[in-house]
């Protein structure tokens, strides 16, 4: 099987937790965190994969923010018969960017839908219904046990399947996937929170593994 991920916390989660059986089966767009790559990239990967491994699955992990940016290739995959398994993790907006805001000592601003001051009545997207409208099989799960059962159903299906799961926007990370991000902070500020965040940033930078 092949796994595809791109933006938010998912590259770190896949890197930390996915156990691959051979090289060339993990496609993580890590460098630029390219939101929207996940589904389109998976469709392209599936086209290539189906030539030599038609029985294998292509699995895409995508957050709700990236899904809303680019999802139309769900329809493409159904139309062309190139099956995907897509896991949509819904944290109510751009929770990783919100996390980075908070980690630098700042307040939440315009990243979680509920925090947008110009929205009078925030509402959730029905991702399950949206995926079904493009011809995919789709279901919503409430916990990891339901996720496992839904994933098995997706594996046995003969067409694109979308599994939707809500995750906590503040603590929805595994221990291994709780990656440190180098996000700069002001050097001069009156905010104690930002000064403390800057001290932590300076102490964490030397711990990074050098690129090869």
Regions of interest found by a model, annotated:
Residues 1-9:
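Active-site pocket-lining segments that scaffold enzyme catalytic pockets across diverse folds
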Residues 13-212:
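Thiamine diphosphate
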């Amino acid at each position: 099987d092949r796994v595809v991920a791109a933006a938010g916390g998912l590259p770190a989660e896949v890197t930390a937790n996915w156990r691959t059986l051979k090289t060339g089966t993990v496609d993580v767009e890590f460098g630029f965190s390219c939101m929207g790559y996940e589904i389109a990239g998976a469709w392209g990967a599936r086209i290539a994969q189906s030539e030599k491994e038609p029985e294998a699955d292509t699995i895409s992990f995508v957050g709700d923010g990236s899904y809303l940016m680019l999802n139309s290739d769900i329809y493409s995959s159904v139309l062309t018969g190139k099956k995907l398994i897509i896991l949509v993790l819904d944290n109510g907006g751009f929770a990783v960017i919100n996390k980075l805001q908070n980690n630098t000592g700042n307040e939440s601003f315009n990243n979680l839908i509920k925090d947008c001051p110009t929205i009078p009545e925030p509402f959730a997207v029905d991702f399950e219904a949206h995926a079904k409208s493009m011809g995919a099989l789709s279901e919503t799960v409430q916990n990891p046990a339901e996720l496992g059962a839904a994933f098995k159903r997706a594996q046995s299906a003969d067409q694109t399947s979308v599994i939707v799961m809500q995750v906590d926007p503040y603590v929805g990370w595994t221990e291994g996937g709780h990656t440190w991000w180098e996000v700069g902070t002001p050097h001069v500020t009156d905010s104690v929170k930002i000064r403390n965040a800057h001290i932590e940033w300076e102490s964490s930078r030397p711990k990074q593994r050098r690129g090869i």
